[in-house]
């Protein structure tokens, strides 16, 4: 069985009963599926206006099915319905982000990459501290010798 996630964005100018009715009508097309999770995320501000609307109701459904025609029917009805502003259907088994959290090899590879990144960051910080200490020592040496000390301004001495 393939795992899917659907996010549905319904017009915000409807009252909650009407929005729930729209979402439930579309969800009814997903009969013969095993619904894992059914989230109503409430009225939310949109990042940008869609059809001159600034708010919308968001619904998220997670389910498993083997029948792709149900997904196609849901997509068709969501496009036809004028109260649905946006929808997205994600096959979680083909989604690389999902695979990276489930596949043991990819998890191990990502952990190694994270370790390398942390080591590189620590090495860069250590080198920066060494450069700062060398600069402070040079500055103290020049002051002790009575020579003028040029203040170090980050980026001022670099060639462009």
Swiss-Prot record:
Any one annotated GO CC term: ribonucleoprotein complex
GO molecular-function term, one example from the UniProt record: structural constituent of ribosome
Keyword Transmembrane: no
Keyword entries, A-Z: Ribonucleoprotein, Ribosomal protein, RNA-binding, rRNA-binding
NCBIfam families listed in its UniProt record: S6 (TIGR00166)
Family: Belongs to the bacterial ribosomal protein bS6 family.
The protein, known as: Small ribosomal subunit protein bS6
